[in-house]
């Protein structure tokens, strides 16, 4: 069981207790922590849409510490990030691997950051399937289509040539925060909150 801290606020109506993530959501901060899977993606998508409805002009911050996860779940978050009107600042603390790195790169240009000891990892998608030969062939084609789609998303957000992205994602490619900045996944490495404008 995971322990989630509670925050108690004093208001004119008395005390009110929030779990820490709900309190941070009031400040327009969304956390992506742990593996990216369907339930977590649905929560993040709902938070993005809620914050847009609340104020479509005010920026949203997304803090990422994730080893990655299910590609389709990650792409649902990615598509929603591109769909909503508010600008989304992304910040890696800890790690942003696999789909986590794609979400990090998908933030608003100029507002994508990482803390100095963060680790970022990109790679091609992986998957496994068993069954009849025809079904295996269908799934192999699908994973190649997804690989191509992910490559183009990284090209769009990093400004790198397709050939560079393909070569860089051939195997697990771990990067420091500085290397991720050089690659174009983030715009800035920050040590203190004062270093960031979001």
UniProtKB/Swiss-Prot annotation:
Location(s), subcellular: Cytoplasm
Active-site residues (renumbered): 98, 123
Gene3D superfamilies: 2-enoyl-CoA Hydratase, Chain A, domain 1
Keyword Hydrolase: yes
GO molecular function, one term: ATPase binding
Top-rank lineage group of the source organism: Bacteria
Keywords: Cytoplasm, Hydrolase, Protease, Serine protease
Catalytic activity: Hydrolysis of proteins to small peptides in the presence of ATP and magnesium. alpha-casein is the usual test substrate. In the absence of ATP, only oligopeptides shorter than five residues are hydrolyzed (such as succinyl-Leu-Tyr-|-NHMec, and Leu-Tyr-Leu-|-Tyr-Trp, in which cleavage of the -Tyr-|-Leu- and -Tyr-|-Trp bonds also occurs)
GO cellular component: cytoplasm; endopeptidase Clp complex
EC number(s) on file: 3.4.21.92
GO biological process, one term: protein quality control for misfolded or incompletely synthesized proteins
Family: Belongs to the peptidase S14 family.
Subunit architecture: Fourteen ClpP subunits assemble into 2 heptameric rings which stack back to back to give a disk-like structure with a central cavity, resembling the structure of eukaryotic proteasomes.
Function: Cleaves peptides in various proteins in a process that requires ATP hydrolysis. Has a chymotrypsin-like activity. Plays a major role in the degradation of misfolded proteins.
Descriptive protein name: ATP-dependent Clp protease proteolytic subunit
Species this chain originates from: Ehrlichia ruminantium (strain Welgevonden)
